[in-house]
Amino acid sequence: MAARNCTKALRPLARQLATPAVQRRTFVAAASAVRASVAVKAVAAPARQQVRGVKTMDFAGHKEEVHERADWPAEKLLDYFKNDTLALIGYGSQGHGQGLNLRDNGLNVIVGVRKNGKSWEDAIQDGWVPGKNLFDVDEAISRGTIVMNLLSDAAQSETWPHIKPQITKGKTLYFSHGFSPVFKDLTKVEVPTDVDVILVAPKGSGRTVRSLFREGRGINSSFAVYQDVTGKAKEKAVALGVAVGSGYLYETTFEKEVYSDLYGERGCLMGGIHGMFLAQYEVLRERGHSPSEAFNETVEEATQSLYPLIGAHGMDWMFDACSTTARRGAIDWTPKFKDALKPVFNNLYDSVKNGDETKRSLEYNSQPDYRERYEAELDEIRNLEIWRAGKAVRSLRPENQK
């Protein structure tokens, strides 16, 4: 990028923007402060009727409702779920993040995984206690009033014939991805007709769900109702969204959640970005640039300097903060990239909506040698020159200097 001096000047600001405030009153502390008193009140008096606030915001001329964490302070959350046991099934990325956040918020949450498997051992390492709040899957479901199915998509499909009969009337079925119910023709996940079925989908990995919660910030999430038997499914979804660590939530449908999620992962979030990284890096190398220069101009400057600023201020601000040369070139080339890429993105959306991506995922991830094949793919990516160069570049960052 031509605006080298501008970029260097902006880097301290990017680091500042990426660092959470040191002095922050966290939701975790609030939950701890009221936990004991709420338990006493729950016995002494019936639950009070609470008014749940909703904020209407303008998103580029479109009015949308947003549900904020402030509408559900710790005392209200604990009171709302005082008669519930949240049975979290699966302890992968989302299970880990959401489960620990629920536990820290003081809710009665238990984990259900295969006994003595890797997830069982991982849960024990995180402080879950066998026989107290760690059980095998069947035992956890039998104890739970809200069953949070956070198994992988493939595992949800494989285990559903066994799990479905245990989702009995009066329970609530919770997902964090619309994959299984939406593509039921492929997954065979037909939900029972006599239970509430809801979704909370954090917009980030389970690690991010956990780290933002611990920083007192909270991740943004979508929520949806697939089936409302009790008339309280929407409120329950919002409350659970806050409980698992959301800072705010916006409403969607199961269909829109899964379409946008699969589309985004394959596009700008990972697949498309990786493809652009590779293409730009390879051209630079073919034109005689060194690995360090090619990586810095392709990945390092983007992730360490520009992307944090775009996230904080928007693309218009980024253009305005750059040199006239960088600005002119970026603006001129934007429509060329858009025109070249839009047909690819339309094909991708079609592939998501018609179920091709779901079929591919289920078939691949259900193979007995899935793990070995995946590790081989990952090893190939790890050994690409771009990422081997990146490892060396990252070692030079000040925070990595010993």
UniProtKB/Swiss-Prot annotation:
Cofactor: Mg(2+)
Pfam family, any one: KARI_C
Superkingdom, taxonomy of origin: Eukaryota
Annotated active site: H177
GO terms, biological process: isoleucine biosynthetic process; L-valine biosynthetic process; mitochondrial genome maintenance
Family from the record: Belongs to the ketol-acid reductoisomerase family.
Protein name stated in the entry: Ketol-acid reductoisomerase, mitochondrial
Organism: Neurospora crassa (strain ATCC 24698 / 74-OR23-1A / CBS 708.71 / DSM 1257 / FGSC 987)
Species lineage: Eukaryota, Fungi, Dikarya, Ascomycota, Pezizomycotina
